[in-house]
UniProtKB/Swiss-Prot annotation:
GO MF entries: translation release factor activity, codon specific
One Pfam family linked to the record: PCRF
Gene: prfA
The protein, known as: Peptide chain release factor 1
Entry keyword annotation includes Repressor: no
Family membership noted in the UniProt record: Belongs to the prokaryotic/mitochondrial release factor family.
Keyword Ribonucleoprotein: no
UniProt keyword terms in alphabetical order: Cytoplasm, Methylation, Protein biosynthesis
Residue list for modification N5-methylglutamine: Q236
Source organism: Ligilactobacillus salivarius (strain UCC118)
InterPro entries tied to this protein: PCRF, Pep_chain_release_fac_I, Pep_chain_release_fac_I_sf, Prokaryotic/Mito_RF, RF-1
Main localization (coarse): cytoplasm
PTM annotation: Methylated by PrmC. Methylation increases the termination efficiency of RF1.
HAMAP family: Rel_fac_1 (MF_00093)
Length: 360
């Protein structure tokens, strides 16, 4: 803990320095710098407050132990012992809370996300499962007070999704749903199966942070834009203007097609939003940063084809293969009650990161 306390003292010193800087007229007049320093101070506030509380509790423990060593009457000794016990429990609790606050922050945690769900192996059944996953995430988002905007979808004849893309807006969406990328496997009896046999199908989920203040700038020369007429079921043209848009990022070969919006301009805006997110995600996947290494040691490789979870309908069981978690409440999870799964993934990653922090 000594190294952690050294770091905490440095953070407290910086917090006090920020307080002085934010009172400086020159800083106040510089809106950009003032905003940046205010955010830095706000980010440090909880950690510094916990550290100060920790120091108070540690001092109280020392004072109580000194009082007991001086000799007290039975009634007073009983009160001090109770106070000492409570203080020691609070100290342990504060230590764990402080460790979590000191863990490296994912810079994307506060961001909204773009999610893409695709039916994979399994034909019609895979597309139906993709629709079930969309329903599950939609209900979970509603439980969190988030909003969902469907920006593209390809509906199959059986009412499933060949693919669907959506934006989920809200408080810290990425921090909760970043673990969902990968292959999701379902085991169940399809409605079309007359013999009652269990079939296995898969759907893939890709989760990307929405890049509003885009850290990646796309050179217009690297983007080819094609426009065409939107098509309905069976390829029938549903309007007479070229409102559909296809964008190709030439360096990566990433293609985004958008036709669900009412105008070409709206389709352009949505296509560019998804293209930026996909290109950002593509390059992020290429980087061998320290953060990526931590992710791989924690909740999986991040490989889009990695099987991360199995949904077994006959046994009402959901298994997350990355952390060995099995829950016999598939019905509730598919109804949006994802908290137990996501909380377990967050805890697992925090535990791994904490072990690394303590060993540094």
């Amino acid at each position: 803990m000594d190294k952690l306390f050294d770091r905490l003292q440095m953070l407290e010193d910086r917090y006090e320095e920020l307080g002085e800087l934010l009172s400086d007229p020159d800083v106040i007049s510089d809106t950009k710098r003032f905003t940046k320093l205010s955010k830095e101070m706000a980010d440090l506030r909880e950690t510094v407050e916990k550290y100060n509380k920790y120091k108070e509790v540690t001092q109280q423990i020392s004072d109580d132990e000194e009082m007991l060593s001086d000799g007290l009457d039975d009634e007073m000794a009983s009160l001090v012992k109770e106070e000492l016990s409570n203080a020691k429990n609070e100290k342990v609790k504060l230590e764990e809370e402080i460790k979590i606050l000191l863990l490296p922050k994912d810079p994307n945690d506060d961001k909204n996300i773009i999610m893409e769900i695709r039916g994979a192996a399994g034909g019609d059944e895979a597309s139906l499962f993709a629709a079930d996953l969309f329903s599950m995430y939609s209900k979970y988002a509603e439980r969190q007070g988030w909003s969902i905007e469907v920006i593209d979808k390809n509906v199959t004849e059986v009412g499933g999704f060949k693919e669907i893309a959506l934006i989920i807006n809200g408080n810290s969406v990425w921090s909760k749903l970043k673990y969902e990328s990968g292959a999701h496997r379902v085991q169940r009896i399809p409605v079309t199966e007359s013999a009652g046999r269990v079939h296995t199908s898969t759907a893939t989920v890709v989760v990307m942070p929405e890049e509003e203040d885009v850290e990646i700038e796309l050179d217009p020369k690297d983007i080819r834009v094609d426009v065409y007429r939107s098509s309905g079921a069976g390829g029938q043209h549903i309007n007479k203007t070229s409102s559909a848009v296809r964008m190709t990022h030439l360096p990566t070969g990433i293609v985004v097609a958008m036709q669900d919006q009412r105008s070409q301009q709206q389709n352009r805006e949505k296509a560019m939003k998804i293209l930026k997110a996909r290109v950002y995600d593509y390059y992020a996947q290429q980087e061998q940063s320290e953060y990526d290494a931590n992710r791989k040691s924690a909740v999986g490789t991040g490989d889009r084809s990695e099987r991360i979870r199995t949904y077994n309908y006959p046994q009402n069981r959901v298994t997350d293969h990355r952390i060995g978690l099995s829950l016999n409440k598939l019905d509730r999870i598919m109804n949006g009650e994802l908290e137990d799964v996501i909380d377990a993934l967050v805890l697992f990653e925090q535990t791994k990161a904490m072990e690394k922090l303590e060993n540094e």
